[in-house]
């Protein structure tokens, strides 16, 4: 089971001015229509005032548009995981408590992934020992979904190697498809997660993941074409002429 396809993976940074150096993933799920529109707003700000190589948001912005959204601790490229890798344990607690203040226990969850990686096992263990047991925040069982079908594995890895100049290591992350519940359970046991943190969190996470899937009732209106409305600067006959001007300028800057 996993829920990442139902929301937005944002790039979070505590200080937007340092986002280029501190980008990390943060999963946001639209529980309600208001939450969906708040994700739209976050996405807009991330791509305009928060664009530093990639779209980013910071905690003040997230706090402003948090209603109707469910958030999680996210994967091994999350803020907390990055802090763990840098041995900044106190910062992990501060960030976790910030998220609890913004979302509360009802809308903030601990993600456990079953990847057969040492870094994943360490992260899962810290999440349970330091945060699940102390704060009583429920777990989720999640998979990084990079492609839909398992048969897409080889193509995905080929593209990943191209993007990383051949430095991509496939070990431990060979099943990044949209996995079934049975596959997720098998991945958990294959990675030996139960020996480290206990299988009770696997079954708790499965039930929480199903609960979130039922709670997320936001609906996308795919039948209506909604064109953005914006003011056209003077000197242009209309929006089409202005858009063509922007496209031409953008193309010339890339050539």
Predicted regions and their residues:
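Phosphodiester-processing cores and adjacent nucleic acid-binding clamps
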Residues: 1-255
């Amino acid at each position: 089971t996993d829920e990442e396809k139902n929301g937005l993976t944002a790039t979070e940074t505590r200080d937007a001015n340092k986002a280029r150096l501190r980008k990390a993933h943060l999963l946001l799920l639209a529980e309600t229509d208001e939450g969906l529109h708040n994700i739209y707003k976050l996405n807009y700000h991330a791509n305009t005032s928060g664009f530093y190589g990639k779209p980013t948001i910071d905690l003040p912005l997230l706090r402003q548009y948090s209603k109707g959204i469910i958030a999680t601790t996210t994967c091994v490229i999350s803020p907390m995981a990055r802090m763990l890798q840098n041995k900044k344990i106190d910062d992990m607690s501060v960030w976790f408590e910030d998220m609890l203040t913004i979302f509360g226990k009802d809308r903030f969850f601990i993600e456990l992934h079953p990847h057969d990686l040492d870094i994943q096992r360490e992260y899962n263990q810290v999440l349970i020992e330091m945060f699940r047991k102390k704060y009583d925040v429920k777990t989720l069982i999640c998979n990084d979904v990079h492609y839909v079908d398992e048969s897409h594995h080889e193509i995905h890895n080929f593209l990943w190697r191209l993007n990383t100049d051949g430095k991509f290591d496939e070990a431990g992350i060979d099943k990044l498809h949209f996995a079934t519940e049975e596959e997720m359970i098998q991945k958990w046991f294959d990675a030996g997660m139960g020996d480290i943190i206990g299988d009770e969190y696997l079954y708790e996470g499965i039930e929480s993941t199903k609960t979130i899937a039922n709670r997320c009732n936001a609906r996308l209106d795919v039948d209506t074409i909604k064109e953005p409305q914006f003011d056209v600067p003077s000197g242009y006959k209309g929006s089409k002429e202005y858009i063509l001007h922007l496209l031409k300028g953008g193309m010339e800057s890339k050539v």
